[in-house]
Curated annotation (Swiss-Prot):
Protein name per its UniProtKB record: Adenylate kinase
Molecular functions (GO terms): adenylate kinase activity; ATP binding
Annotated gene: adk
Domain of life: Bacteria
Similarity annotation: Belongs to the adenylate kinase family.
Keywords from the named record: ATP-binding, Cytoplasm, Kinase, Nucleotide biosynthesis, Nucleotide-binding, Transferase
Annotated region described as LID, given as residue ranges: 122-159
Catalytic activity annotation: AMP + ATP = 2 ADP
PROSITE patterns per the UniProt record, alphabetical: ADENYLATE_KINASE
Subunit composition and interactions: Monomer.
EC number: 2.7.4.3
Region (NMP): 30-59
Gene Ontology cellular-component annotations: cytoplasm
Length: 216
């Protein structure tokens, strides 16, 4: 089973991706991980990627697609795979299609943006230990203070409201069009991946069961 999981940052894709991969015994494939591994292994594509990264450039779609095609030929992908954070653009989706990479399911986790902002901007962290809290859903015993050490909690830069809104804006402009792309393809062609949307609001188990229902 070959799966693409879509959804905005903070929608809970990571948790659901782990659930899917465990249930179906398939690997979670991240382009970031692929790049790091290719660079470390000095593969031809890794060498090309490193040249671009060393000067602060953006990795081309050709390199990304090449890495993806290499990765899905490995033994652990024989039962399928789950793409995490890929494709990000229509160009990448078209390249997958052109190169004959079969996708069975595209699952979109939908969460209202204001809910995501509340989720992410409410996070607080104790950096030394890695403990995390939430001002609403999992508050510390004393506001702003770690339960164990009594030290101050901080809000990570990535969780600041302005940062979250900026990331959501990028997602809306760049990745959200993929939803329309896969919906349109499915409506026109029976061989297209099956697209389904899942409401990402609720308990982790509720969202998990909705995702499984789409895949079944």
């Amino acid at each position: 089973m070959n799966i693409i999981l879509l959804g905005p940052p903070g929608a809970g894709k990571g948790t659901q991706a782990t659930n899917i991969c465990q249930k179906y015994s398939i690997p979670q494939i991240s382009t970031g991980d692929m790049l790091r591994e290719a660079v470390k292994a000095d593969t031809p594509l890794g060498i090309e990627a490193k040249k671009v990264m060393d000067v602060g450039g953006l990795i081309s779609d050709d390199i990304i697609i090449g890495l993806v095609k290499e990765r899905i030929q490995e033994n652990d992908c024989k039962n399928g795979f789950l793409f995490d954070g890929f494709p990000r653009t229509i160009v990448q989706a078209e390249a997958l299609k052109t190169d004959g990479v079969k996708i069975d399911f595209v699952v979109e986790i939908q969460v209202p943006y204001e809910d995501i902002i509340a989720r992410m901007s409410g996070r607080r962290a104790h950096l030394t230990s890695g403990r995390t809290y939430h001002i609403v859903y999992n508050p510390p015993k004393v506001e702003g203070i770690d339960d164990i050490t009594g030290e101050e909690l901080i809000q990570r830069t990535d969780d600041a409201e302005d940062t979250v809104r900026a990331r959501l804006n990028i997602y809306h402009k760049q990745t959200k069009p993929l939803v329309d792309y896969y919906q349109s393809w499915m409506n026109k062609n029976s061989d297209a991946p099956k697209y389904g949307a899942v409401v990402g609001v609720g308990t982790l188990d509720e969202v998990r069961d909705r995702v499984y229902a789409q895949l079944n």
